Amino acid sequence: MTERSELYKKGLEMRKNLRSEAEFQKNASEYAEDPMSQEFIDVVTETVCGGLWSRPGLDVKTRTLICVVSDIATGRYPELEIHLRFALRQGWTEKELTETMFHMSGYVGVPLVREATFVARKVFAEVRAENE
């Protein structure tokens, strides 16, 4: 087995913190299906999760909201689905996330936020069902 850097180890812990155990295992098995995907998630784990998400200065909850906002502003809806789940897991409420989206409509435009609300509605329903 390859010896992993400290950043990789921090990043792996961060990835586990952001997802439920079931989501983490599903995600890990999807990336393990081929070498390119595995190498990609290893790079993301070390650089993004270990290097950025683990930095001091902002708590993880705030970082999840930054990701939600950046996904909406750039129209990255598949990533928005992931980051909304992270945000809910870190304690943001559906109401707070919805209000964030509404507020953004004045700055990034109604069409981007409209699409984001469709994603959010789906994610909110799935997470509520998973928690029942």
Where are these regions (language model features)?
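Structural motif
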Residues: 56-61, 91-97
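Short acidic alpha-helix initiation/capping motifs at coil-to-helix transition points
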Residues: 42-45, 74-81
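Short, flexible domain-boundary/linker segments around small modular repeats
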Residues: 48, 100-103
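Extended intrinsically disordered, low-complexity coil regions enriched in Ser, Thr, Gly, Ala
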Residues: 77-96, 114-118, 123
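Acidic, glycine/proline-rich low-complexity segments that act as flexible tails and inter-domain linkers
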Residues: 1-60, 115-132
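Short, structured motif recognition centered on aromatic/hydrophobic residues
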Residues: 63-71, 101
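A short structural micro-motif
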Residues: 72, 90, 103-110
